[in-house]
């Protein structure tokens, strides 16, 4: 695998620097290097990224621009679905408190359906993807702790593993509450 550019960084490796405050162990950081060896280099980059995601490294640095951009976009879409589910569900639940009851269902029902749709789409497409456990790191201080000076790419994408259990619980709970509200409101509107 070393021929494909696979390198683990840890204490004592050539990737460390004296200015780092915290040394990273071999299980903390994985770098997908942009080394083209043959026709299927892109497939090899994707394979390495999959292996790194499944191995649950704390940091994954992606040098190949195309795969890094695709991964960052995929994570951004997942974040957008999560935030939309939470915000639309919150709007669904709190609109009846802010608007007159005669008009609140015009906003709360579509918001509830949107929340449920986003939560369902997230659950189907992102929940079991190992990428959903990662976020793109933009914080300069945290990035300075990583051995980025050893890279050949000037714009790598850095992923950091974060626990998403609370986030999933939040949007599932809000979407479920929005569903209950919508069913109750539809029953009241059409059964009476």
UniProtKB/Swiss-Prot annotation:
Q: Does the keyword Transmembrane apply?
A: yes
What is one Pfam family matched by this protein? Mito_morph_reg
Region annotation Disordered: residue ranges?
1-20
Q: Which residues cross the membrane?
A: 84-100, 107-124
Q: Mainly resides where?
A: mitochondrion
Membrane topology reported for the UniProt record: Multi-pass membrane protein
Report if keyword Transmembrane is assigned. Answer: yes
What's the subunit arrangement here?
A: Associates with the mitochondrial contact site and cristae organizing system (MICOS) complex, composed of at least MICOS10/MIC10, CHCHD3/MIC19, CHCHD6/MIC25, APOOL/MIC27, IMMT/MIC60, APOO/MIC23/MIC26 and QIL1/MIC13. This complex was also known under the names MINOS or MitOS complex. The MICOS complex associates with mitochondrial outer membrane proteins SAMM50, MTX1, MTX2 and DNAJC11, mitochondrial inner membrane protein TMEM11 and with HSPA9. Interacts with IMMT/MIC60.
PANTHER family given in the database record: PROTEIN PM1 (PTHR15099), TRANSMEMBRANE PROTEIN 11, MITOCHONDRIAL (PTHR15099:SF2)
Q: Its family?
A: Belongs to the TMEM11 family.
Q: What is this protein called?
A: Transmembrane protein 11, mitochondrial
């Amino acid at each position: 695998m070393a021929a494909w550019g696979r390198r683990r960084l840890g204490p004592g490796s050539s990737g460390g620097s004296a200015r780092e405050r915290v040394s990273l162990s071999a299980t903390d950081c994985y770098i997908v290097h942009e080394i083209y060896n043959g026709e299927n280099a892109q497939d090899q980059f994707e394979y390495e990224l999959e292996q790194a995601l499944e191995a649950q490294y704390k940091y994954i640095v992606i040098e190949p621009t195309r795969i890094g951009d695709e991964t960052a976009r995929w994570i951004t879409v997942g974040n957008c679905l999560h935030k939309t589910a939470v915000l639309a569900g919150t709007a669904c639940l709190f609109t009846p408190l802010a608007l007159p009851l005669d008009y609140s269902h015009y906003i709360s029902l579509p918001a509830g359906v949107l929340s449920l749709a986003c939560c369902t789409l997230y659950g189907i497409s992102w929940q079991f993807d190992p990428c959903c456990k990662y976020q793109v790191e933009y914080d300069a201080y945290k990035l300075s702790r990583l051995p980025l000076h050893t890279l050949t790419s000037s714009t790598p994408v850095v992923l950091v593993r974060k626990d998403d259990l609370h986030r999933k619980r939040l949007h599932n709970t809000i979407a479920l509450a929005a569903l209950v509200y919508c069913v109750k409101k539809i029953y009241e509107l059409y059964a009476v």
